[in-house]
Amino acid sequence: MKARVHVSLKSGVLDPQGKAIGNALASLGFTGIGEVRQGKLIEIELEGSDRAAAQAKVEAMCKELLANPVIENYAIEIG
């Protein structure tokens, strides 16, 4: 079973990498671009087939390591 964790900065938290990407896109001639925010995608291969147990395990991983709950949001997909 595969888990995907999408981590992004909370609204209001400065995102210098997103700002740099936005500036680079503008310098390449792309127009009509508003705010750019960068996040990360983490894929984890899990053993077993119990979706509820997998969700709980990945939730614990997020709280302990994968995301900083003070400045980041995360979303979990189990598939």
Set out the residue ranges of the language-model regions.
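Solvent-exposed beta-strand sheet faces enriched in polar/charged residues
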Residues: 6, 36, 45, 77-79
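N-terminal glycine-rich anion-binding loops that anchor highly charged ligand groups
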Residues: 31-37
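Short capping/connector residues at structural and topological boundaries
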Residues: 18-19, 38-41, 71, 75-76
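Short glycine-/aliphatic-rich beta-strand segments at the starts of folded cytosolic domains
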Residues: 1-11, 40-44
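Short amphipathic alpha-helix segments
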Residues: 12-28
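Short, conserved charged micro-motifs
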Residues: 12-16, 49-56
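Conserved functional loop/turn residues at catalytic and ligand-binding sites
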Residues: 29, 45, 69
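C-terminal structural segments of small proteins and small subunits
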Residues: 52-78
